[in-house]
Amino acid sequence: MPLTVDYYFAPQSPWSYLGHLRFWDIARSAGAAIRVLPVDLGGKVFPVSGGLPVAKRAPQRQAYRLVELKRFGELLGQPINLQPKYFPVNGDDAARLIIAVDLHEGSHAAMGLADTLMRAVWVQDRHIADEAVLAAALAERELPARRLGDAHSQTVQERYEADSQAAIDAGVFGAPSYVVDGEIFWGQDRLDFLQRRLAQG
């Protein structure tokens, strides 16, 4: 029976961006299903897990974060703007849009849209809290424009809240986190361990 990975992430997270396509490739190669679960990291997960938004971290931690982002971007050959114009940014609307697409078009389309939105922040200096940017992302992925309206539905909001709570219940405290049968792999730098776990079946 194929394994399922619960993929908890935030569309505004640089670490989610750096791991996104590699994770997708690993899951596909292993024949694993992906549950696409964008979560309210700053509003729900951090307050109960001891995490802090970047701006509230000690200066030393903020500085080293930039060092690590640069290192991993270079190591992985992925372009990344270390200090994008629109960051910090509220990722709630982008997360809800991903959920709306997941509900209607499925996980493959949702993963593709998530990639587009992450690149918008970390490569293209676009503002993912701007409805025009979200609409453009849908168009780039050839997804229905009406998903923008669906993203504001009660169904989507309830799913967003439920997924954020599920992350907390699973012990998730940061993004990205990949959970397989209750086992957490936190961070894009743990994808090798996830790959080994999926290979075990």
How should these model regions be labeled?
Residues 3-32, 37, 103, 112, ...:
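C-terminal cap of thioredoxin/glutaredoxin-like
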Residues 11, 17-121:
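Structural alpha/beta surface segment adjacent to cysteine/selenocysteine redox centers
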